């Protein structure tokens, strides 16, 4: 089975193109003083490409993953002097694995419905567990430490929190619910995608998160250094993800 990162791009009608173009031009006219030169460049670039109506091939999950890793590597080639080697490795590994959870059948049913619905006709009625949560419980602490000799036990918590919360989703699923969901819709698929036998998920990783996005989890004091590392990983991960999703190869 082929796994996809997002839905096929919608081709706009001429009327829709004209409407979006007018709205973006009005935005520039009314709020030009509020934008940076980079912001204006992006908006004008989007306007100029609205007429590009040729349908693009649907991006596979592997292609999207490779694009984000490449974006991170290009960024560090230019700005790497401002980061430690460990920081760069942490960000690149987060880019590599943050979307693994998209291999789950429910997500694939949304972005690749024809292929999935041939086998699962009721796929649209099943509630999806957010893909970031699944990604973060697919790797163990020991597997993480083997990714780089630079990684320590202390790095696991900020790293896994950045992957788990790379999108802001309500955090209402506990380990038994995730395991049950994965047994039906994820374990087989992630094993196929990664070309390795994923025998179990590591839902105990939830206990290592710096925070849970819900109203009932207990909060414990966290060292400022851990928060700083988490913010660095998540901030750059989101930066590169948004850059690639917008169609750019390089982040500024």
Specify the residue positions occupied by each region the protein language model found.
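Accessory nucleic-acid engagement/destabilization modules that flank
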Residues: 3-12, 25, 31-32, 41-57, ...
């Amino acid at each position: 089975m082929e796994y996809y990162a997002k839905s096929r791009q919608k081709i706009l009608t001429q009327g829709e193109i004209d409407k979006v173009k007018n709205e973006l031009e009005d935005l520039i006219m009314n709020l030009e003083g509020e934008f940076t030169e980079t912001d204006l460049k992006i908006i004008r670039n989007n306007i100029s490409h609205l007429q590009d109506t040729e349908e693009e091939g649907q991006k596979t999950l592997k292609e999207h993953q490779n694009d984000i890793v490449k974006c991170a590597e290009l960024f560090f080639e230019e700005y790497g002097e401002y980061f430690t080697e460990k920081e760069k490795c942490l960000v690149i590994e987060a880019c590599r694995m943050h979307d693994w959870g998209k291999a789950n059948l429910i997500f694939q049913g949304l972005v690749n419905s024809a292929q999935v619905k041939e086998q699962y006709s009721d796929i649209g009625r099943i509630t999806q567990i957010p893909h970031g949560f699944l990604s973060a419980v697919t790797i163990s602490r020991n597997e993480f430490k083997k990714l780089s000799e630079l990684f320590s036990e202390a790095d696991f918590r900020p790293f896994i929190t950045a992957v788990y919360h790379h999108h802001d989703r309500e955090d209402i699923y506990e380990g038994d619910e995730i395991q049950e969901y994965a047994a039906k819709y994820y374990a087989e698929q992630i094993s196929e995608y990664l070309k390795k036998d994923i025998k179990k998920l590591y839902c105990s990783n939830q206990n290592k998160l710096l925070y849970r996005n819900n109203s009932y989890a207990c909060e414990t004091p966290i060292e400022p250094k851990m928060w700083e590392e988490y913010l660095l990983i998540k901030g750059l991960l989101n930066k590169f993800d948004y850059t690639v999703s917008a169609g750019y190869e390089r982040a500024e």
